[in-house]
Amino acid sequence: HAEFFGGIRDIYYDGIQAEDPNLIESLLYWFNENEIRDAIDSGTGPEYFAHLLPVSEDPREAIKNWTERPETPGAEISFRNAWQELTEAAENHNAPGIFTTFMGWEWSSTPGGANLHRIIVSDADKQTATSFFPFSSLDSPYPEDLWQWLAKKEAETGVRFLSIPHNSNVSKGIMFDVTTARGNPIDTHYAKLRTRWEPVVEMTQIKGDSETHEAFSPEDEFARFEPFPFYLQNGTEPYVPRKGDYVRAALRTGLELEQQVGTNPFQLGMIGSTDSHTGLSTAEEPNFWGKFSRDSVPENKSDSALADGPSGWTMSASGLAAVWAGENTRDSIMDAFDRREVYATTGPRIQVRLFGGWQLTESDLADLTANGYAKGVPMGGSLGSNEGPEGGPAFLIQAMRDPMTANLDRIQIIKGWVDKTGSSHESVFNIAWAGDRTLDANGKLAAISDTV
């Protein structure tokens, strides 16, 4: 999180760095340093930092109360030390063609407990990354201001940036609303700006699944998958699912907005990520280490499991980002994100390919990848106008299980469309499945008895 940015670790080990503070400031620094150290050493860090979360209130009213952050020289030094250390680690471990690292951070605007967080990814190297300091929600809580800063830095440095919305399921309906965080209706300018900077969204992670909810997909038997009925705030508040929280609803809202303003602001590729805060890639169910590093210590697990609110053990073992890149390099992976040739899994390393086109036929399955690229577009692409025979588009789809995990149940296509009145709809189609099951009269498929 750019708002604290590893500064807590720097303070824990090296103290708050300030030049010549007066007596009162010195006492405050000493108190804060020791309070932080005591909380971490006693294992009560999560409880200590919970009081920093916002209180529950109307997000659009809360965001109006934002004021520019005051000058805090000691904290600024600690944060810059952390950024220097992080960029060095990323650069030292980047091995093009073998293992790719990125310079990035999280922008964590949470007005009134509404999660508007974005993950910022760049293709910067260490030298370029240290020429700027990450933009945080303390600089501005509005996504548009973040995008403006990214555009400015891109022009100054030549660095490519991506802004990836995440945990939209706890955004209190604002992440994919038809109005902006400032309360203005989405217009053409905003739609184009958002499309430019946010081609991809994170739809599954440790704090639940953001694809859809049974309130908005009542005919989908999988819409109850991995809910997270909590908000990121001080105090409790009953969870209320809102249309603007979920990605599948956002895709439909984008189609509706395109009819109104001429641009679809929510034409999104989808990825998963862990957000585990442990530094461990443990997204698989049998290899789950919890949300925080404290959860990874065996003797702490029973206490965490009994907590009333969200904890590392009320969360999901999820997820992974899969990217169809030409090579394992920063440039190639960023290119794949830009064209949305990405997908999400909840942890298993399932391999999925999808191509769409107007002239694809069943015979193209013989060389799915070559024919898919030659005669169609890959996942995340736009089909364009009908260039083939009468009828709709065709799709080539291939899914292969992770050899270390369960068998696959089925492949589905979820269709979203806008009718003549401008209203959107969705329909779920089962197109391939394991075993000798058959579709019923409503196109439904019985649950698989065993996926192992």
Task: Identify the residue ranges that each predicted region occupies.
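An N-terminally biased module of ancient metal coordination in phosphate/nucleic-acid-related enzymes
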Residues: 1-103, 111-113, 128, 135-138, ...
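C-terminal functional module detector
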Residues: 6-9, 72-75, 87-90, 105-115, ...
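Histidine-centered divalent-metal-coordination microenvironment in nucleic-acid enzymes
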Residues: 117-119
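Long, charge-dense tracts
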Residues: 121-123
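Substrate-binding clefts and substrate-entry loops adjacent to catalytic sites
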Residues: 128-130, 218
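Short, contiguous clusters of charged residues that form electrostatic/catalytic patches at enzyme active sites
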Residues: 84, 144-148, 249-252
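Short loop/hinge segments at the start of secondary-structure elements
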Residues: 142-153, 170
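Short connector loops/turns at beta-strand edges and beta->alpha or beta->beta junctions
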Residues: 125-126, 208
